[in-house]
Amino acid sequence: MVNAKEVKKVIKENGINTKKISVRCSIEGYEEVIRVTLKDIYLPLKKIEAIVRKAFEVVGYDEYSNEILAGGNTFVFVEYDYNIYEEAVNAKLEEAEAKLKELKNQPVTYGYELANKGNLVIYGNKETDQIIITDKTDRSKRSWYNINKYDMARALLALETA
């Protein structure tokens, strides 16, 4: 069975400080589960997830139905600490309200650029009440429907921490 020290060692070997990372390893049913919790919103979640999955994740699939086979799998879950994430979202609420007002006052109904960082852009769509984060190749990364100030704050945070 994998232990938390091994997981942290692999993360550290890839140049990431592990002081604000919590790791829990457990056996649930016939499966091993590795849960990594990031306690800093600026830690690279996708990169850490890729590192841990490459090193430890093992999932067996049925060759015909492609269903996950029971037993012997190791699943990896990486997420931000809920309280820290919500604090960061709440810190973006004022900016989010301003962006929603900006979108509402635009004559453009589809594809209005609200914010950008590097190759990522947040577009607003008044017609479908949607915001989308895409890259410069127009591949959608995330989207929110029936948007409110919290969704906009989450989008702004996702853009900032990308």
Question: Which sequence ranges carry the predicted segments?
Answer:
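Short, surface-exposed linear segments at secondary-structure transitions and domain or protein termini
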Residues: 150-159
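Acidic, low-complexity, intrinsically disordered interaction modules
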Residues: 41-101, 108-150
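Short edge beta-strands and adjacent turn/loop segments
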Residues: 19-41
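Short, surface-exposed ligand-recognition loops at beta-strand->loop->(often short) alpha-helix junctions
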Residues: 1-5
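Extended, compositionally biased alpha-helical segments that mediate assembly or anchoring
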Residues: 103-106, 156-157
